[in-house]
Amino acid sequence: MKLKRSREAIISQMLSICKSGACKTRIVYQANLNFRTVNPYINLLLEKKLIEAKKGQTLLYETTEKGINLLDNINHVHSELSEL
């Protein structure tokens, strides 16, 4: 039986996906989520200003500077832990 991913792992993956801008469909497929599950995460990331919504022909979500800093910190912690 495969264990569920942690909330932090999902958020980290979503921040990574949104670095170059991503629509909701791309986030859903690349993060292996469904549309019902992804909405609360998008709302949380928008509320915390870790991503921003950019309106154009399609609505794109892009990781903010604050989100990139958080992602870098998460990746640093993961690399430190993997060396133990």
Tell where the protein language model's regions lie, with residue ranges.
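Short amphipathic alpha-helical interaction segments
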Residues: L33-E47
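A short, conserved structural fragment
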Residues: L46-K55
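Short alpha-helical segments that sit at the start of domains
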Residues: M1-S12
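A short acidic, leucine-rich amphipathic alpha-helix
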Residues: R26-Q30
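Short capping segments at the starts of secondary-structure elements
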Residues: C18-C23
